[in-house]
Amino acid sequence: MVKKEMIAMILAGGQGTRLKNLTKKIAKPAVPFGAKYRIIDFTLSNCINSGIDTVGVLTQYRPLSLLKHIGSGIPFDLNRLNGGVVLLSPYVKESEGYWYAGTAHAIFENIDFMNEYDPTYALILSGDHIYKMDYSKMLDFHKEKNANVTIATINVSFEEASRFGILNTNENNMVEEFEEKPKIPKSTKASMGVYIFNYQLLKDTFEELKSKGNNFQDFGHNILPYILKKYSKIFAYEFNGYWKDVGTISTFYEANLDLIKNHKNLDLREKNWTIFTKSSSHSPQYITSGGNVVNSLVANGAKIEGHVSNSVIFENVKIGKNTIIEDSVIMSNAIIGENSFIKKTIIMENTVVKEKMVLNSLNNQSLNEEDGIILYDGKEK
């Protein structure tokens, strides 16, 4: 194999239990998003647009949907003779075999794959966040600082901070303290789960911890505190664009609707930063003479005979006559009957909504999943 300056490893095995029925049959990174994409498409597209042509995707929980979606990498321009995209599942070695016990353990178990490319730098990513980021600029920062590790950070509210790894830095952005999900945060500078490691240092750290019999399941709890204490030179790279962890029903809903709010850093039509995906062969969308669409994303294959506003409509959705859809996310192959009213609701894939159905948090308290948002699969509770 030809040596690579930097390869990317995408952690994509998460179950995403807080997304409830959305991840009942598929891994969180494979959840459909934004009318035609999957969540992982954003991280993969960031890699391609940043000039990274060697990507390992680490799967675990219900990987079939991801395997089918990514395949050989053709839709993502990652079908390369030297590099490309490789899907990596847990496997049994000669003397041992485990499910991945955490983020760091998943990377450690795939060191052999990484060694094939002898990279100078390892880019570690999560496959379940929505954002657009040029990793090459982060690498330039890493080199400029002569860092051992660089962590991408975003500023969050104090109320949110206890959900993240929190960094305390000096005036030069050098990390002085790292706390994983602190009860009382000392700052609001949160880790995005995007790391650049000097690869040799990462390997040495794994070997040192293993030789001492230490646990190294997780980057936030184990690897980063160890490197900070022994080697230091960890820097924070401040990211000022749009970023969202879509790990809950409310954040998944919000991120979908953010696509129609003209966020300058979440523009799907940006010419120089394509979001790649596996495309379907559906016919063009069809809006009948009685149909009306206002400020919405509508994918191919959709047929709209009712009124849709401020919503995201996925592929092959059918919306009946006189039906009103407001502030909602309607996922692929859903059929919405005539004379229905749907507001602030996520309709799951392949769901059939009966005629004259009313779905909103005021009328359906038993279906109210989170922050007034309904997640509906056609089954009454």
Swiss-Prot record:
Annotated coiled-coil positions are: none
- Highest taxon listed in the record's lineage: Bacteria
EC primary class: transferase
Annotated EC: 2.7.7.27
Q: Which InterPro entries match?
A: ADP-Glc_PPase, ADP_Glu_pyroP_CS, GlgC_bac, GlmU/GlgC-like_hexapep, NTP_transferase_dom, Nucleotide-diphossugar_trans, Trimer_LpxA-like_sf
Membrane-spanning intervals of the chain: none
Listed name of the protein: Glucose-1-phosphate adenylyltransferase
Question: In which organism is this protein found?
Answer: Mycoplasma mobile (strain ATCC 43663 / 163K / NCTC 11711)
